[in-house]
From Swiss-Prot:
Transmembrane feature ranges: 6-26
Function: Represses PhoP/PhoQ signaling, possibly by binding to the periplasmic domain of PhoQ, altering its activity and that of downstream effector PhoP. PhoP-regulated transcription is redox-sensitive, being activated when the periplasm becomes more reducing (deletion of dsbA/dsbB, treatment with dithiothreitol). MgrB acts between DsbA/DsbB and PhoP/PhoQ in this pathway; the 2 periplasmic Cys residues of MgrB are required for its action on PhoQ, and thus PhoP.
Membrane-topology annotation of the record: Single-pass membrane protein
Membrane-side (Cytoplasmic) residue stretches: 1-5
Localization per record: Cell inner membrane
Protein name: PhoP/PhoQ regulator MgrB
Amino acid sequence: MKKFRWVVLVVVVLACLLLWAQVFNMMCDQDVQFFSGICAINQFIPW
């Protein structure tokens, strides 16, 4: 039963990361001033 909890935890974390990446890309597309520096770094990270 403990292993099942770990699987759920990993899936939730991965889902959050994917969602965060989507939001990040939207912000970069809109060219928000605050995110411009982070977006430059973000281009080097393969999502």
